[in-house]
């Protein structure tokens, strides 16, 4: 495991000591949680390490970690990094690599560990060579550009000049403003039309790495002949030093030495001198002075980099642009390409990894207490990320034609593959399996539905029920499903294996008691109803899943379920069924619509939201009935239930959460409890109340709220017995209600959240996230656009409209690109992709595919048919596509898939009509389909030559969907921490979130998107509690992590840059703060364009900092732009606009332009007066400032008159033009970034402070009575009560 969340020091996370009681986390109260936190805190200790040839040094370790982790630290340290083959000894005993430190006898504070060099084996020698190669390449970004080995890019250090922690000390002189160059580049100024691409990946000065060797490669004399093996030769290396010396090196069991071989003569005898060294680096230091100098300098640089810049990410991130990287000779990479990996991971003695066994064994680990759960989750997560990487490599090998099919005689589309113990199949409808469901379209969507099912069952995590490791890879237009292999499944026919479910969509169905028992446990969390279907012999068969879900017992005796594509109920808005009428809300909006396949399912988030909505309604109804009974109005009950169900259908989000009658609700809770206790004697009336409420909301039970769906309803070919007809009718109604719920509740909810800016999408990815969180599928895009267009003030949703349209265009283009690519063979890929991009984005009217390659293809076509060309099209058909034709297809795809009419015939019309920009569309399409293009400036608008040439297409990457295993305990701590923060207990919140961070690190390693959220919130809390340097350190990690895991221009990364800029400013690092803001100001228009609501906040930040460094004209450009954007999205009378006016007024005042300043402050004052009233603090402040400005203006006028009258003899009073103090700038920055709670008046604050202090004194008194420590607690108390007043400030942040 690599470095944890420390800055290069070996700070390992505290891991959990076993808890006293082994209860599940879920059963714990909050007190329980806090109890647990205290137990987990774990003290590290210091040990000394003795290494041959290096002075003894100390490192910090934790009792929880393994010996192996000390190995890892030594391989990372500057002075010991070149050693790999050693053991650690304590008092002469060799330590087991996998032993936990706490289990080692006599291992304690001050122990001395000895590093002892061990003899090499072939495997150890390979590991050593690979490690040295990694050290030589440690600053080289090519692996990140090529998307290899979980490397990814980060550019933060370019804008901070290295690590912020250290440079903070150097840059403390932030007040000497003369040294700061504040001029932003032209292209980031408001209103600039220029969108350059090159600055996206600035050249890092470390990237011209110091070259240590010219060539370092395996020798052609490998492997050693038998007699040399018996002398201990393991392998031979060939090196050319920078001094042009050619040397041949033997790796032997004792180490490395020079031999006498040349390129053409084999002479394995040691050279004279042979310099036998245990490490390759020590040998090369002797041979080459340049190597010695440069290697040392390189390692110094490597360890100075922030660990987060170099730690591998759990899943590979691909970059859509890259500069021209020189292709250097690299022996390890060359060997990797031609052999199965022999590195750390892949090489388990004698075999490739048995993925299925690993995936299932990790699930079987015990989970009684926290340490066990952490260990289990860490193992699950690690194996999943390894499996995903292997599956991705395999899928690419399959499509590139490098894997032999297991059924080679069949047609290409029908072939299946096994590679590295993973089974691969292609997303085509083979053997008409999906004929009734939409053929190839259904076969294409089925793997993702299946993956969603696997996700859901994995999350429920029932003991004894197993799913397959599943990864879905889209690559070069093909969809490949990769699955782990059930032991024994390949030896028998599917018909014999399946003991539960159906292999023919419900004609023959079987069931099995053990499967029913296991699936029953998942049915409540997944809301699946147990139901009965008829098989082909009209026998009743009981199921607890959809019929397609198959149960197979493997040869390992485990119960597997597979084909989970119908885990969630069908979406009736896209499944017209004869003879069924949909609710009026659906028909009014034009549903149901015919879709290209019949596998449209509701998302799990939608099912959960729908059930939650029904539960609120159930409580409301029951409470209402109870109140009525109390008033003895029994006769109203009948009509009430019916109006309730009517009300239910039309319930919009506005009515959804009315305050329930608390009295009634309390009674209902009581009623539920008494019913459970005395089933017989319960008052029949109370039963009736619950029964009525249950019936009205569609609960499957009559005594409690329980809503479940039957996933087989509306499945063609599935029949139900007669006695369950009523139940089936109820289920149909429930599905119709759920379909209506998407349209009447969830889509309006999304729009409302966009309006009040609680969700602010900036690109396709963030839009999809927002829709998916609310359970809205992307096929509803057209409907969402309709709703947005009909909004009363459409301009307030401009940003959403623009992203929606861009998403419809790029997704339609993606669908077309997929089939387009299937007809292209490997040698023509670059030409075909550049031709497609030209047709899609270039203004060049007659884009013709590049002729040379076109001729090549047609001449060679006959020979090349053996390449995996799964499309039925002619290999050169792609070359005939024209821009007109492509855009016509995009428009028809948008209509048929999203039911949206695009009003454009070519790219330039689309840009004009919908106010889009080509660079953003280019980014979207590249990310969606995995294209990587050359980093350079593209001229999209030239009418004389096409935008892209085939040299511009650098690579095509896979787009991978996989399961994301969760760190559940850590997540609970994180949520409790957020809750505490929102209640205003910052200190307690901070402790819980720190604990969550430890646990996240434990499970995920150092890099993960959830750790990123954790660090962001911690930084915010540090900042609010006044610890600016800690805030800076945590936020720096958050930025690095966001760049590495989500992408350098992902909207979240842009946000992280803005937070970091604020903390830099607070730490007096003004120029760094500006650099970071300028970076964000470059990225946002690239991703979205000008005029996004978030741009107002960004421009206000930039304007304020520029004001602080006295760049008044520049400052005004940004602040006035922010004012315009705020007025557009929040309305001209909003408080945000008032604040914008005030900020602009302040700058005009410092410029001495009092008339403009007065005008803006008056506008602000009017808003405050109308919104908050005359007595509000804000209104009064504004009024005071107006008076001051008026006085200044009068003074100025008087001076001017004096000058006019008396000319140069005038006796003038000097005017006060004061530059703003940094403190006042920081105050304003805090306000606009939501760090202070604006609308609270002074009186409110005092009330709040008194209340907080009263509560804390109460708490302290209780604690004091228990601990007799009242005295020591007092100072701490007053501190926290102060910080609690700012609590409101974190609420908006923590919600994300």
Curated annotation (Swiss-Prot):
Tagged with keyword Repeat: yes
Subcellular location, principal: cytoplasm
Domain Clu: 333-575
Biased composition, class Polar residues, residue ranges: 1278-1296
UniProt KW keywords: Coiled coil, Cytoplasm, Repeat, TPR repeat
Matches recorded under InterPro entries: CLU-central, CLU_dom, CLU_N, CLU_prot, GSKIP_dom_sf, TPR-like_helical_dom_sf
Region named Disordered: 1-31, 1261-1296
Single Gene Ontology MF annotation: mRNA binding
CDD domains: CLU-central (cd15466)
Record's function text: mRNA-binding protein involved in proper cytoplasmic distribution of mitochondria. Specifically binds mRNAs of nuclear-encoded mitochondrial proteins in the cytoplasm and regulates transport or translation of these transcripts close to mitochondria, playing a role in mitochondrial biogenesis.
Protein name: Clustered mitochondria protein homolog
Ranges occupied by TPR repeats: 970-1003, 1012-1045, 1096-1129, 1138-1171
Basic and acidic residues compositional bias, start-end: 8-26, 1263-1276
Keyword Repeat: yes
Lineage, opening ranks: Eukaryota, Metazoa, Chordata, Craniata, Vertebrata
Subcellular location: Cytoplasm; Cytoplasmic granule
GO cellular component: a single term: cytoplasm
Record family assignment: Belongs to the CLU family.
Residue ranges the record marks as coiled coil: 662-689, 1242-1274
GO biological process: intracellular distribution of mitochondria; mitochondrion organization
